[in-house]
Amino acid sequence: MGIKYSSKINKIRTFALSLIFVGVIVMYLGLFFRTSPIIMTLFMVLGLLFLVASGIVYFWIGTLSTRAVQVVCPSCGKVTKMLGRVDLCMFCREPLTLDRELEGKEFDEKYNKKRKN
């Protein structure tokens, strides 16, 4: 079984969503320390920081998403956004590229790394 890829925008959104869950869980763990207000406050503040970080990531991916190149997927025909030289369709996971050199090659996220000259 091969590596399961996802579009870059969806990966970043998933990361931001996981930050929300981590923040809520950390705040919930703080409730177990109700007898110690200092420890409980630390957990609550740490959880709040995770939630704020999530908001920052969501804002960042939103601004990045507005600048992403929109292409029509040849497989499903839906408009999807591309970041980098290669990306996947958000809907059907079809490998997409705007680089003529990479057409027909096996999909690999390494193509998005900057080349050292």
From Swiss-Prot:
Pfam families, per this entry?
A: DUF2614
Any one cellular component term from GO for this entry? Answer: plasma membrane
What is its subcellular localisation?
A: Cell membrane
**TM regions (residue ranges):** 12-32, 42-62
Report keywords, A-Z: Cell membrane, Membrane, Transmembrane, Transmembrane helix
Principal location listed in the UniProt entry: membrane
The topology of this chain with respect to the membrane is:
Multi-pass membrane protein
Note whether Iron occurs among the keywords: no
The record's NCBIfam families line, in alphabetical order, gives: PRK02935.1
Tell me which family the UniProt entry assigns to this protein.
Answer: Belongs to the UPF0295 family.
Specify the protein name. UPF0295 protein GTNG_0491
